[in-house]
Regions:
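Conserved catalytic-core element of eukaryotic-like protein kinases
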Residues: 2
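Conserved catalytic-loop position in the HRD/HxD motif
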Residues: 5
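Activation segment of protein kinases
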Residues: 15-58
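C-terminal lobe helix-coil module of Hanks-type protein kinase domains
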Residues: 45-146
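Juxtamembrane amphipathic/hinge helix adjacent to a transmembrane helix
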Residues: 145-154
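C-terminal or otherwise distal, non-catalytic regulatory regions appended to signaling enzyme catalytic cores
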Residues: 153-185
Length: 185
């Protein structure tokens, strides 16, 4: 499956801390097209869309991994990697612009995490992680370094209308790495 709309709004965290991906409305089976989702159609959310999606090219699991990279970038820095005045301007930046280093915003982020996120954000699918298991392995290798930066200032608020959850940044990154291994493998 290729989800094609991985974004913070489609990633839910249960009260128990389990990560769930939702909204499979524009999902496709890899190597399969329908009239609604054929090559040339642009589907997805501009802030989280892969370069190939923004160009209407075929998508793959690497496209979803790119989108996950945008989510991790925003989770760590507090902002998406690319912003424009319009959705089209934002989508164009995914094609043309290079993302800033995460350490520009957070000096305490381990180099291994920064490198993993930047690898996810490569413009060409062949330059990204080959599969979710490779990404998951790299993120789990960084678990000790992530836990070392766990401070009160690293708490991330996830708010729903009724319940407010607080998770540390390292816990969220590790949880996302686990969900990555289950969705795209």
């Amino acid at each position: 499956l290729v989800h094609r709309d991985i974004k913070p709004g489609n990633i839910m965290i249960t009260p128990e801390g389990k990560v769930k991906v939702t909204d499979f409305g524009i999902v496709s089976l890899q190597n399969e097209e329908s009239d609604i989702t054929k090559t040339g159609s642009i589907l997805g959310t501009a802030s989280y869309i892969s370069p190939e999606q923004a160009q209407g090219k075929p998508v793959s699991k690497e496209s979803d991994l790119y989108s996950l990279g945008t989510v991790l970038f925003e989770l760590i820095t507090g902002r998406p990697p690319f912003e424009g005045d319009t959705p089209i301007a934002t989508a164009t930046k995914h094609i043309t612009d290079k993302p800033e280093k995460l350490s520009t915003y957070r000096a305490d982020i381990p180099k291994g995490i920064e490198n993993a996120v930047l690898k996810l954000l490569h413009k060409y699918p062949k330059d990204r992680f080959k599969n979710a298991e490779d990404l998951r392995a790299v993120l789990l290798q960084q678990k000790t370094q992530l836990q070392a930066i766990q401070t009160q200032e690293n708490l991330v608020d996830l708010t729903s209308p009724k319940i407010k959850y607080r998770f540390t940044l390292p816990a969220l990154i590790i949880s996302l790495s686990i969900v990555v291994g289950t969705i795209w493998t």
